[in-house]
Amino acid sequence: MIKKLFALSILAVTLLIQPTHAQSAEQLHQTAKSFMKQGDYANAVLVLNKSLQIAPDNMSIAKDLAMSYYFQKDNIKALETIKPVLDSKDADDQSFQIAGNIYKQLDQRNELEKLYKKGIKKFPESGPLYNELGEAVFTNSKLDAIKYWEKGIQADPGYSKNYNNAARYYFFTTDKVWTIIYGEMFVNMEPTGNSTPEMKQILLDAYKKLFTENDLEKNNKDKNNFVKSYLETMNKQAAVTNAGINAEVLSMIRARFVIDWFATNTKPAFKLFSLHQQLLKEGMFEAYNQWLFGATENLSAYENWVKTHAAENTAFTALQKSRMFKAPADQYYH
């Protein structure tokens, strides 16, 4: 009887200790996160190691420890820490991104490619992993890179960086459509992003490239119905470009394009064009086009436009801040 009571006492003490340890591990983890935010990775490593000792199966702690080693440029330790995470049932696509950053810093390109392919096999709908794999193979195989970025757009249409890379890739090819489509989608997904000003310039140049030919459909070899419909509709606006391309002309061309696109119910549904239609109806389409092209094409003219259209610009800016652009999963046409 005494033995049984002793055993029960030990069990009770163990059960009481376990939650305390778990809580302590979480408290330590939060402390370490504060150090990470401050850029104090030495202290973060110190605290995370203690936290992981209490909760060795906590993959979130292990990921942060690997990242802290990475930022300290202790890549061997970082790799040792992240590898068990990759093989665990709790691995997520972020785990593979962290490991990828470590392999990049170690300049182990072959391992990097294998890692991302392994990650995609486990997470076939991860836009970030397709994007990273595309960037990893770009130097050796641009064709493979664009395939991965396209797959990323198809699998995870809400992730922006595949659009960015794909738009830049197509700009340096004979393609006339997808730089414009993907570039504008990226800008709407990241309206204040660091890459957005450069993408706006690419978009402006892409429209100039599009209207170089008098007949936009003439040399089109793409049998894609979306592309054919796009070029056919845009071709009707070619005469408007006789005086060149600028923000005002593009606003006119694109307004007419949207009206024509929605004139019948035969064109494919497309979120970007639906946004254009909404802005037209609400009287903000010119403000949107000025935001998209104005500052890039002529900064002083854009600043003057903002002054003379203050109410329109304010209304658009408020809308821009309140919305989030996300492409639907069923509107991939390439």
What are these regions (language model features)?
Residues I61, S95, L129, N162, ...:
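TPR alpha-solenoid repeat register
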Residues D64-M67, Q97-I98, E132, N165, ...:
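Canonical tetratricopeptide repeat
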Residues Q38, Q72, L106, T139-N140, ...:
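Structural motif corresponding to the intra-repeat A-B loop/turn of tetratricopeptide repeats
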